[in-house]
Every structure is written in structure tokens, then in C-alpha cells.
Amino acid sequence: MREELDKIIEGFRPGFQADGMDVSVGRIDPAGVIEVKILMGPNACEECLIPENLMADMFRAAMRDVMPALERVDIVREKPG
């Protein structure tokens, strides 16, 4: 399942990288929760991010085919260091 979710994330990666960030799949809870990590680079444009609730909805819609029981996507921002 992780490989399939990583492939979905790949489609979003260029947009995040354009703003100095990266994105990856974090924790996967089979009960229906996926963690998506937003990795903030040193020159990241934090103001460029859409609101987290909209981002979670966007990822959830894209990931539902892989994990039909998906209830929630948690967005976690990580800064280097």
C-alpha cells in the first residue's frame, strides 16, 4: 500500500518543490488515517501553502482508491534541524 501512496504523492511533489518544500507519506494507520509530511526547506514559502484542511481533502480524494477505508489525512509540517 505504501508504494501506491508514494506514487500518488509523486504527482503532488513538483508543486511543493517549486515552493521550496517536499512531501512524503508518513504513518499509515489501517484504521483509516494517513499522515502526510510537508518537509519545509530552508527557503520554503510557507505563505504559499493552501490551508491544511483543503490540503488534507485534496490528498484524501487522491488516496481513496488505494485505501477505501480512508477517513482522515493528517498534515504534519516538518522543518529541518
Model feature map: region roles:
Residues 1-81:
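Domain-level signature for proteins that mediate thiol-based redox and metal-cofactor handling
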